[in-house]
Regions:
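Juxta-kinase regulatory segment immediately upstream of eukaryotic protein kinase catalytic domains
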Residues: 1-41, 238-265
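An alpha-helical support segment within catalytic cores of ATP-dependent transferases
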Residues: 17-25, 29, 120, 130, ...
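ATP-binding glycine-rich loop module of kinase domains
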Residues: 41-94
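A glycine-centered beta->alpha junction motif in the catalytic cores
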Residues: 59, 74-84, 126-143, 187-188, ...
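Conserved kinase catalytic-core helix
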Residues: 95-112, 135-171, 176
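Short beta-strand micro-motifs within the conserved protein kinase catalytic domain, predominantly
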Residues: 114-124
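Catalytic activation segment of kinase domains across protein kinase-like and atypical kinase folds
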Residues: 121, 128-131, 135-137, 164-206, ...
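C-lobe/activation-segment region of protein kinase-like
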Residues: 185-266
Length: 267
């Protein structure tokens, strides 16, 4: 069995049980459930009646999140920063954090699916969001300058409001009719906000540089982040390059060179 299989484990859910929970707790009469395709580690995503997006968070998902968080904090320490990622003690704690995070992002003017309800089940948790019909993840979308600019604008807005995403990736950005939405943020300690902001920026620079020229990505980021922000982000790019889903998909040398040129640090 591969390490990936061990970490992911078996986090399948009984659809009949899910339907019953929705009937009992949310007052649904007819419940039609369809799975969402994707490489999902931290929840089981489902679409309900083509109206709601449901994330089922299992004990296995919570364990996997804890393992990932430990690895990220270790990476932050190795880079000379952190640790600043928070762990959660249970599936319902994870779900409540994501509910609150989405609510706060929307209050800050950052587009995110509207959170509807958190339901505590028998060990697992159920997190209900509005369903964004016709969405694509950024990894599946055509990337252009305006979309990338909007990603950095929203990230800046998030940070200016004292928030951080903590798990930025192309899969955690949705595009609907040209509008950009953030999803799946993780927990960040308040006293680690500055480092978390730099980590967010490093993730965005790395992920977007896997699709576009690093010089183009850095130029667009520079419209919203100053030289100090870009330099601080470089503290984390080596760690970011090890993340599942990014995994050496961008050139460290090219990204570092692009940042050096943008900040005037090129020799």
């Amino acid at each position: 069995m591969s390490f990936r299989s061990i970490v992911r484990g078996d986090s399948t859910v009984d659809v009949k049980d899910v339907k019953q929970v929705l009937r009992d707790e949310c007052g649904f009469d007819d419940v039609d459930i369809s799975p969402v395709d994707g490489d999902n580690w931290l929840s089981v995503p489902l679409v309900v009646n083509d109206e709601f997006f449901l994330k089922v968070v299992t004990v296995q998902n919570a364990w996997t999140h804890s393992l990932f968080t430990t690895a990220r904090n270790l990476g932050a320490r190795v880079s000379g920063n952190g640790p600043f990622f928070k762990t959660f003690g249970s599936p319902v704690e994870m779900a409540r954090h994501e509910f609150e995070s989405a609510r706060r992002m929307r209050e800050a003017g950052v587009r995110a699916p509207e959170p509807v309800e958190v339901i505590e089940g028998d060990g697992e948790a159920f997190l209900l969001f509005e369903y964004l019909d016709g969405f694509e993840t950024l990894s599946d979308s055509e990337l252009d300058g305006e979309t990338v600019r909007e990603v950095f604008r929203m990230l800046r807005r998030l940070h200016d409001d004292g928030l951080a995403h903590g798990d930025f990736s192309l899969e955690n950005v949705l595009v609907v009719d040209g509008d950009v939405y953030f999803i799946d943020s993780t927990g960040v300690a308040e006293d680690g906000h500055d480092d978390a902001v730099a980590y967010d920026l490093a993730c965005a620079l790395g992920a977007l540089s896997s699709r576009l020229s690093p010089s183009v990505v850095v130029d667009l980021a520079s419209e919203f982040f100053d030289a100090g922000d870009l330099r601080h982000a470089l503290d984390f790019v080596t760690v970011v390059r090890l993340r599942p889903g990014i995994e050496e998909s961008f050139s460290l040398l090219e990204l570092r060179t692009a940042v050096a040129e943008a900040t005037g640090d090129a020799s």
